[in-house]
C-alpha cells in the first residue's frame, strides 16, 4: 500500500489518493508519503464527506472483504483490489482485481523462455 501512496503519476489519470487507513495501532497516526494513516473505522465517513469514488485495497486476503464492505458503505463506486481475494460487492460497484500471483507466473514463464529457449517449446 505505501508504494501506491508514493506513486506520483496517478494524478495524470485523474486519481488523487487522499487518505490511507489501517487497523494496527503502530501504523495509525504515522505519515506515509505525506498522508496520515487513519483508523479504518473512519473510512466510510471520510469517503462520503470527500465524495470519494475509487478505493484501493492493499490488505491481506482475510481482511479484504471487510475493507470492501466499509468502502461500499462509504459510497465508493469503484474498487481497485490488490488483495489476493475475490470480493463480493453489490451490483453497481465496479471491481478491478489485480492478481499479482498470475502476473508473477507470466513473468517467470517468459523469463524461463529467455533463459532456456530449447526447453520452453
Tell me the role of every PLM-derived stretch.
Residues 33-120:
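Phosphate-bearing ligand-interacting subdomains
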Residues 27-30:
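A glycine-biased structural micro-motif
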Residues 1-14, 18-24:
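Glycine-rich adenosine-cofactor-binding loop
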Amino acid at each position: 500500500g505505501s508504494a501506491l501512496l508514493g506513486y506520483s503519476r496517478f494524478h495524470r489519470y485523474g486519481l488523487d489518493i487522499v487518505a490511507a487507513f489501517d487497523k494496527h495501532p503502530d501504523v495509525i497516526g504515522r505519515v506515509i508519503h505525506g498522508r496520515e494513516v487513519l483508523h479504518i473505522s473512519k473510512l466510510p465517513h471520510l469517503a462520503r464527506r470527500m465524495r470519494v469514488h475509487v478505493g484501493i485495497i492493499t490488505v491481506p486476503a482475510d481482511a479484504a472483504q471487510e475493507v470492501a464492505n466499509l468502502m461500499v458503505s462509504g459510497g465508493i463506486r469503484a474498487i481497485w483490489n490488490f488483495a489476493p481475494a475475490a470480493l463480493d460487492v453489490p451490483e453497481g460497484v465496479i471491481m478491478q482485481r489485480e492478481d499479482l500471483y498470475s502476473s508473477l507466473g507470466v513473468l517467470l514463464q517468459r523469463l524461463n523462455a529467455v533463459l532456456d529457449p530449447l526447453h520452453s517449446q
